[in-house]
Amino acid sequence: VPVSPDHQHANGEIDIASLHAQDSTGLLARIDRAVVWDIPLTTPFRGITRRDGVLLHGPGGWGEVAPFWDYGLEASAPWLASGLCQALGNSLLPRYRETIPVNVTVPEVGAQDASDLVRASGARTAKVKVSGSSDKRSADLERLEAVRSALGRSGKVRIDVNGAWDLDTARENLPLMDRAAGGLEYAEQPCATVYDLADLRRAVDVPIAADESIRLSANPLEIVHRRAADVAILKVAPLGGVHRALDMAERLGLPAVVSSALDTSVGIMAGATLAFSLPSLSHACGLGTTRLLAQDVAEPSVRPSNGTLRLDAAAPVSERLLSEVKAGPYLTRHWQTRLLHLAGALHARRQREAR
């Protein structure tokens, strides 16, 4: 595992007394430990090669806060709310199932690597990342063909475009990718806007799933009002915690897929809690992404076995593993500052919602 230069003097422990003294909101008052982690990825993903975040410890155990660095304060504040929900203790939720079907995530890798990933996972559903770039379309199609071959005819293939296509490109690409995949279960966020998703959904036979149009939108219900999606992708952290995600699922009224955001096992457990608590779950969930991290913070790591995550999965944080992934002083200082900014943004958001 490559070690960043920052790890040579790794500390990772945020000074709690200093954090409390600077937190004018009181949101972090019951947090008794905050540890910044920094982990390499096994393969580049979304243009990054490392993932970092902070684990918060409180009366309820560990919670994770890990918004990507290109997210602004408003988009990142719900991630703190989610981490605090975990660390301060969730109220008990119903459990409707003992296992969760989980997809294997296939990054933008070559066809052979894609095939190997699918076969090794044992999953019956594959989520394949595709590029927004026209010069990479042939590689996308080859990857999809390889995934279908590895899954066999009975498996399900879905693609994730992260809103990279305009409407015309989506109309052109989706039929090609549907054919290469031997039939797509759905296309996740092929276009960025709800208007384009709605137009595309009327123009093609491939079901449409909404991700960014839910978690980054000021009005997520617009996808329902405009009939822009067949499936809702729910990510706990960007929605502000399990309870808010459950509420969103109910308000949307669409079949839901619970997904993660390159989380450690601590973050995955928040997603698993949501998936176990949804009254209906008809699609495989995207909760197998710890495989994309070169290391983890829990032992055992929360990973699906043959495409299934069990109810008894847990995320016991290992001090030994935590010591191996603690961030260096530079990143630790940045996360302490960011936590305080997030607390301010979350406090302001809650004040607005209370009016």
Where are these regions (language model features)?
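Shared catalytic-loop signature of beta/alpha-barrel
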Residues: 219-221, 225-321
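N-terminal capping/lid subdomain adjacent to the active-site entrance of alpha/beta enzymes
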Residues: 2-180, 298-355
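Short, solvent-exposed coil/turn elements at secondary-structure transition points
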Residues: 40-42, 108, 214, 262, ...
